[in-house]
């Protein structure tokens, strides 16, 4: 950003969330970092791609927001995976458990979308484990630089590493549940 600014131009970092579905539907969440005036100039272009467009702050803050997003998504996927695995191993029907949870405080987009993938065993990639693993690596490297402990993020990164080590890096990140299933010697559901 600094080099571009020195040349007399503006720089915006603008990572997105919403995956392939959001891109096709022009409903991406766009997290922008950079100067206000530059943001306002290009906002009409962002509006062609997304619905939730936020100028988070200065240069780099868009990327920081994206990494924070990836932390939340990873931890929620792990939580849904653990909950459904626990329920299934205890003998409950994971589909009915998910249905019940969707009506309460535990309801979330992750439970809705990725919980269903875990139950139906549909791990076709929307966002690949390998890419999410890279993002968590950025989070952990940034945390080290900042002197911040992110123990839950480190745990989720380890689960993704287990998946990658077992050839699952190209599956959807909801397949993180497979690492939990390997440790429990139990699958949430049968295909």
For each feature predicted by the language model, list its residue ranges.
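Beta-strand segments within the central parallel beta-sheet cores of soluble alpha/beta enzyme folds
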Residues: 93-102, 154-158
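Interdomain hinge/lid region at the active-site interface
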Residues: 59, 63, 107-174
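Active-site-proximal catalytic alpha-helix in oxidoreductases
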Residues: 25-33, 54, 58-90, 101-113, ...
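Short, basic/aromatic-enriched C-terminal tail that caps enzymatic domains
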Residues: 171-191
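Rossmann-fold dinucleotide-binding core
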Residues: 1-74
């Amino acid at each position: 950003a600094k080099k571009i600014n020195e040349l007399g131009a503006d720089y915006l970092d603008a990572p997105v969330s919403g995956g392939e579905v959001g891109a096709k539907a022009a409903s991406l969440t766009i997290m922008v970092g950079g100067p206000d005036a530059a943001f306002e100039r290009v906002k009409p272009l962002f509006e062609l791609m997304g619905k939730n467009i936020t100028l988070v702050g200065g240069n780099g803050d868009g990327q920081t927001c994206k990494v924070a997003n990836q932390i939340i998504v990873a931890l929620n996927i792990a939580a849904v995976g653990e909950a459904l695995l626990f329920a299934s191993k205890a003998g409950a029907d994971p589909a009915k458990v998910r249905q019940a949870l969707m009506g309460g405080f535990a309801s979330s987009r992750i439970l809705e979308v990725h919980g269903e993938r875990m139950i139906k065993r549909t791990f076709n990639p929307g966002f690949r484990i390998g890419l999410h693993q890279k993002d968590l690596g950025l989070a952990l490297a940034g945390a080290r630089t900042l002197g911040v402990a992110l123990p839950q993020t480190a745990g989720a990164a380890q689960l993704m590493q287990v998946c990658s080590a077992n050839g699952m890096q190209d599956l959807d990140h909801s397949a993180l549940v497979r690492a939990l299933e390997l440790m429990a010697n139990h699958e949430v559901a049968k295909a």
